[in-house]
Amino acid sequence: MPSLWDYLNKDKKPVIKKVEPPKKKEIKRDIPLFIKYRPKTLDEVENQEQAKQILRDYVINYKKKYKGKALLLYGPPGTGKTSSVYALANELGYEVLEVNASDERDAIHIHHIVGEASKGKPLFHKGRIILVDEVDGLSGKEDRGGVGALVNIIKQSSWPIICTANDPWDQKLKKLREISIMVEFKRLSPKHVYNVLKKIVTNEKIKISDKILWDIAYKSGGDLRAAINDLETIIKSGIIDENFVKALGNREQEIDIFKALGIMFKTENLATAVSAFNNVDLEFDEIFPWLEENIPVEYKRLDDIYRAYYWLGKADIFRKRIIKTQHWRLLVYAQIDAYGGIALAKNKKYPGFTRYQPPKRLKLLAQMKEKLEKLREHVSKLREKLHMSKRDIIKYYVSFALKLKNLNKTVADKFLKAIGLSLKEIEEIR
């Protein structure tokens, strides 16, 4: 039986409400300013005119003029090395295959990634640039064969290979330097950094005083990436204030040992000489042999050389006392005697450029390390065949082969072939 409510509403049609699904909230994804304002063309890269010219010529004329050679871009961080490569690739319609040498460090990874990329053809681009970023990261025990593998790939590559480094003078990179065109990216001046910052705030319509932009530019130490990141920090904090900029502090810039030696040897000011090595990433004990090696390289007069070694000797006394007593407060006196004493040992400044040398003992250590690597490699090869311990192989077979080689090369060659080695391989570990 129908209810009273049904009777009263019998002529009314039911109202069906359309339920809208809830709208998805738009998530704003902020692109970092450094990425947003990365140069799109090579002309947009601030300064570095000579470097840009060499880079363009190398990539465009690689197959005609530069096949078998790499381009090694070096200089302080934030000077535009990586950005320049991407900007040129964008201009030419090339793809960039980037490998970070700090991540892909050994021969297997280098062969697998860079080796394959050096042969294949891009599907959607006119050409390819292989970028090995932070190639100075290829140093250390875990990187066996990494540089050697890269050098072999460069010699056969169908595409231009560009490497970047903050410090290209590492002994491990010697073979790479020999087949590379070295291109320096110089530290940017505050004016060049300011120009980029001004362009960003104008485009972003941000009100910020020129004084603050100049402060950021000076504090960056020529590192454009750091300056843009500092600008972004200030904008996002909402505190656009000179005191906030001061709170960010200055960026200490590492300098290489060669530059520090140049500052110390060329100055006649004690304070400049003593502070020359402040931003060098080496301990005093590691710097000491560099001083010892380069005094006669810089100084030509005997009395200057005598005085310089006299002060270095005084510093060495302090150094030995520190080792014996662990009184590290003496380090200051050792540094003053070493850096200040050597700088003020000369009667007058020597003009012109000096090519400083790494210590001979470092070269000898590097050579010894290379020979030990070869020895390990050959002993491992023999171990599979002879089923003996490494110690016994070196004691009985390798030492005998070395003696036999000096007595009779023909007999030595037959003996080595019988155990699976050659005269050339035994020469490598001599």
From Swiss-Prot:
Domain of life of the native organism: Archaea
Residue sites binding ATP per the record: G75, P76, P77, G78, T79, G80, K81, T82
Keyword annotations of the record: ATP-binding, DNA replication, Nucleotide-binding
Example GO BP: DNA replication
The keyword Nucleotide-binding is assigned to this record: yes
Transmembrane segments: none
Record-level Gene Ontology MF annotations: ATP binding; ATP hydrolysis activity; DNA clamp loader activity
SMART domains found in the cross-reference section: AAA (SM00382)
Entry's family note: Belongs to the activator 1 small subunits family. RfcL subfamily.
PANTHER family (alphabetical): CHROMOSOME TRANSMISSION FIDELITY FACTOR 18, REPLICATION FACTOR C SUBUNIT 1
Quaternary context: Heteromultimer composed of small subunits (RfcS) and large subunits (RfcL).
Role: Part of the RFC clamp loader complex which loads the PCNA sliding clamp onto DNA.
Protein name per UniProt: Replication factor C large subunit
Organism: Nanoarchaeum equitans (strain Kin4-M)
